């Protein structure tokens, strides 16, 4: 029997403490109060002018060393309690989705934040400093009220007032279990990586919980169930920033602000109200990487301990020349981490130039082909002129505005990281259309940046892999919850179209004996269109006259569509096609050996050709397949693109003009099981919010909604575990401790981590970190704190 690893043992020893965490959170969630009167908060209310009722809440804090199991402990909460699991960032939400095998939204998405709210500026808050919890809550509410009030307006239009007023608690509980948790179906809200959120987000979550439940008149509101916000993260790893945009200067202003974790620790009135001394759990030992010296290093940074010469020497062993990290030909397949977006873009540009010269030959990637796809932006003339007048910049041109706002255009896709260049500008009366080319690498891994529709249209893998999928019925189990007839119809089409692969191999091998045996394999009667023995003879003779022709297609019917056949008929057809596939595979393996099962097998819903390795083309006028939403759980491998029109089931959507939509292909990706899917293009609307509150829709941009995993900023990697990581701290004279901490703690194995310098030799003195560490050390000495080793 294999001996359990150190990480497994550490997780098992922490089991009892995690149970204690679940128990305390369950106790907090059971608290009730007289429901606050929410009718105060109507469309005329503003916390800057009037004081509303205090909104009770409770919090539980989970902090600790990077990789110590903070995020993993969330799975215990998910299994034990009815709770809404969210991430502070898209990456954190994706990691949670991956671990829990369920959809976890960002906290912004959970409370109703939309892309248009990005440009609504937070206020500075009331001038008078608040010393009690009521005043602090009002101050925090003031900061975010412009966004909150807009969310309230949209919610009250969409949801009927008193919608759940007459439901019993049991009926409401059953209804809540049928769907995904929301702010009005549970009072336990978990936020992973909460250290990246500004403090006012906590108050926004509390306020919107009470407002939503009051508006819908849920049993939660009527019973006065107090929201329990579980904040997970590390205050020494992360910073919260606040971004504002100066329209007159066309420039971003970014400044640090209190994050939720430090807000709970530092403000005495807040920590006393939430009883932080009793509602705090600290995870101590790193379980992501169980190397003792590595774990000691992380604890030293976490608790702001003195850095010994021995520790500096330990870090020296990871240092390699910066040129090796920046060279795409070194450390192939490793994820690069950089401090700034500019460095990420520079590395990707260098990688793409190397690939264009080597065509993947020197990169140890069998098919790392470089290809480009257009990204399009359409700036509307009338609204752009209105914007120029509003900000008093009459000389501002479209190209200048685009150059300064390109990173803001993509709310999800992070244009600024991508290697793209403008190739075409077309100016018309109604709009200016700008086309950029963005470079991608075939077979590189990408993540999705939003909720993306997909159309599964094929399979690329091996015969053995497809057989395993059929035997285990994993695909059917994963996709047949709502309309199983479409799943069976899709698989029938793949099986039917894929049968020719067996015949083609026999032709290429020139093996007449194998082809003859293939013809003799029986065909189930429910999939054949032949009614008499003479019909069978005629079709066999026709097939023999054309050696390229597979007799299977002469003898069988094309699979019926999901709309024209019953589920039982589709399942019967599937079982027969599966039987034929397995018989053909067994025959081929017996004839050509076990190696045949590992040969490439490709099948699509239409007759597909792949030109230049990346361009999926067909004589068919439309590409159809199984529709669904692409999973944030999965990492996708980029395979190419297609200009074949794909039906994503959306109608009357014209965010982009027709000629721009025609310029953009859809990207083709492979999921972890080998199924090929097209991803719907991502469309972003750029709406500026003026100081007087007016909304101006200036521009619409179309992109692909994907981010490369070849390189990213250290901030974006927050919460990730990376098997091979190369960190470049750049040319900064001083390195921030939080950057060092996050970057090196991503590694799961110190043997597969390299850095370009020893950051411990030039750490930036950060007084804020020292303050935070003081509270953490106090918690370590507090007997009421739950310590998880």
From Swiss-Prot:
DNA damage keyword on record: no
Keywords from the UniProt entry: ATP-binding, DNA replication, Helicase, Host nucleus, Hydrolase, Nucleotide-binding
UniProt xrefs under InterPro entries: DNA_helicase_dom, HSV_HELI, P-loop_NTPase
Phylogenetic lineage: Viruses, Duplodnaviria, Heunggongvirae, Peploviricota, Herviviricetes
Family note: Belongs to the herpesviridae helicase family.
GO BP field: DNA replication
Subunit architecture: Associates with the primase and the primase-associated factor to form the helicase-primase complex.
Signal peptide segment: none
Function: Component of the helicase/primase complex. Unwinds the DNA at the replication forks and generates single-stranded DNA for both leading and lagging strand synthesis. The primase synthesizes short RNA primers on the lagging strand that the polymerase elongates using dNTPs. Possesses helicase-like motifs and therefore may act as the helicase subunit of the complex.
GO molecular function, one term: hydrolase activity
EC number: 3.6.4.-
Cellular component aspect of the GO annotation: host cell nucleus
Keyword Methyltransferase belongs to the record: no
Principal location: host cell
Protein name: DNA replication helicase
Amino-acid positions noted as binding ATP in the UniProt annotation, renumbered to this chain: 64-71
Subcellular locations according to the entry: Host nucleus
């Amino acid at each position: 029997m294999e001996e359990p690893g150190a990480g497994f043992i550490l997780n098992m020893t922490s089991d009892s403490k995690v149970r204690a965490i679940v128990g305390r959170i369950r106790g907090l969630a059971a608290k009730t109060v007289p429901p606050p009167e929410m009718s105060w908060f109507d469309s005329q209310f503003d916390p800057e002018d009037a004081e509303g009722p205090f909104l009770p809440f409770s919090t539980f804090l989970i902090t600790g060393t990077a990789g110590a199991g903070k995020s993993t402990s969330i799975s215990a909460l998910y299994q034990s309690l009815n709770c809404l699991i969210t991430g502070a960032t898209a990456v954190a939400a994706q990691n949670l989705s991956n671990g829990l095998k369920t959809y976890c939204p960002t906290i912004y998405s959970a409370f109703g934040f939309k892309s248009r709210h990005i440009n609504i500026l937070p206020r500075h808050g009331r001038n008078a400093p608040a010393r009690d919890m009521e005043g602090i809550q009002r101050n925090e509410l003031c900061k975010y009220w412009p966004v909150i009030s807009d969310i309230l307006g949209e919610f009250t239009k969409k949801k009927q007032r008193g919608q759940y007023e007459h439901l019993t608690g049991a009926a409401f509980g059953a209804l809540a279990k049928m769907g995904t948790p929301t702010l009005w179906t549970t009072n336990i809200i978990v936020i992973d990586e909460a250290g990246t959120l500004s403090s006012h987000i906590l108050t926004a979550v509390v306020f919107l919980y009470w407002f939503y439940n009051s508006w819908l008149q849920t049993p939660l509101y009527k019973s006065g169930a107090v929201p329990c916000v579980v904040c997970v993260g590390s205050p020494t790893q992360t910073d919260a920033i606040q971004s504002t945009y100066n329209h007159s200067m066309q420039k971003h202003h970014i400044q640090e602000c209190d994050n939720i974790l430090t807000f709970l620790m530092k403000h005495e009135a807040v920590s006393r109200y939430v009883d932080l001394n009793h509602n705090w759990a600290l995870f101590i030992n790193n379980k992501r990487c169980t190397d003792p010296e590595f774990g000691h290093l992380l604890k030293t940074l976490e608790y702001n301990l003195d850095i010994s010469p021995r520790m500096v020497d330990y870090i020296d062993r990871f240092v390699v020349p910066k040129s090796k990290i920046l060279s795409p030909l070194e450390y192939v397949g490793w994820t690069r981490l950089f401090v700034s977006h500019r460095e990420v873009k520079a590395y990707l540009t260098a990688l793409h130039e190397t690939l264009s010269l080597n065509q993947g030959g020197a990169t140890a990637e069998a098919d790392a082909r470089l290809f480009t796809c257009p990204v399009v932006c359409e700036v509307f003339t009338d609204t752009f002129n209105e914007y120029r007048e509003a900000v008093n910049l009459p000389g501002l041109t479209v190209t200048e505005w685009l150059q300064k706002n390109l990173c803001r255009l993509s709310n999800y896709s992070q244009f600024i990281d991508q290697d793209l260049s403008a190739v075409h500008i077309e100016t018309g009366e109604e709009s200016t259309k700008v086309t950029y080319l963005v470079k991608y690498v075939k077979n590189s891994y990408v993540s999705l940046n939003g909720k993306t529709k997909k159309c599964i249209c094929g399979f690329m893998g091996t015969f053995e892999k497809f057989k395993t999928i059929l035997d285990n019925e994993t695909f059917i189990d994963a996709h047949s919850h709502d309309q199983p007839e479409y799943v069976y119809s899709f698989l029938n089409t793949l099986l039917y179209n894929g049968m020719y692969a067996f015949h083609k191999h026999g032709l290429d091998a020139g093996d007449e004996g194998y082809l003859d045996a293939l013809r003799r394999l029986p065909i189930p009667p429910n999939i054949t269109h032949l009614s008499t023995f003479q019909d069978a003879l005629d079709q066999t003779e026709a097939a023999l006259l054309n050696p390229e022709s597979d007799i299977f297609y002469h003898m069988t019917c094309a699979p019926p569509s999901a709309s024209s056949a019953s589920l039982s008929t589709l399942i019967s057809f599937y079982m027969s096609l599966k039987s034929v596939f397995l018989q053909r595979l067994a025959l081929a393996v017996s004839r050509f050996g076990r190696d045949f099962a590992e040969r490439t097998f490709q099948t699509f819903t239409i007759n597909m050709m792949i030109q230049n390795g990346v361009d999926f083309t067909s004589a068919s006028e439309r590409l159809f397949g199984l529709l669904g939403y692409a999973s944030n759980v999965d990492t996708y491998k980029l395979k190419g693109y297609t200009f074949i029109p794909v039906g994503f089931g959306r109608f009357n959507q014209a965010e982009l003009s027709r000629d721009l939509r025609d310029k953009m292909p859809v990207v083709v990706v492979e999921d972890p099981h080998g199924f090929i899917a097209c991803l719907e293009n991502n469309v972003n609307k750029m709406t500026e919010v003026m100081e007087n509150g007016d909304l101006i829709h200036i521009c619409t941009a179309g992109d692909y909604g994907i981010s490369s995993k070849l390189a990213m900023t250290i901030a974006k990697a927050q919460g990730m575990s990376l098997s091979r990581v190369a960190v470049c701290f750049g040319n900064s004279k001083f390195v921030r401790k939080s950057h060092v901490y996050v970057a090196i703690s991503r590694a799961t194995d110190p043997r597969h981590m390299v850095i370009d310098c020893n950051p411990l030799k030039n750490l930036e003195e950060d007084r804020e970190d020292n303050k935070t560490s003081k509270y953490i050390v106090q918690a370590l000495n507090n007997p009421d704190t739950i310590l998880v080793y």
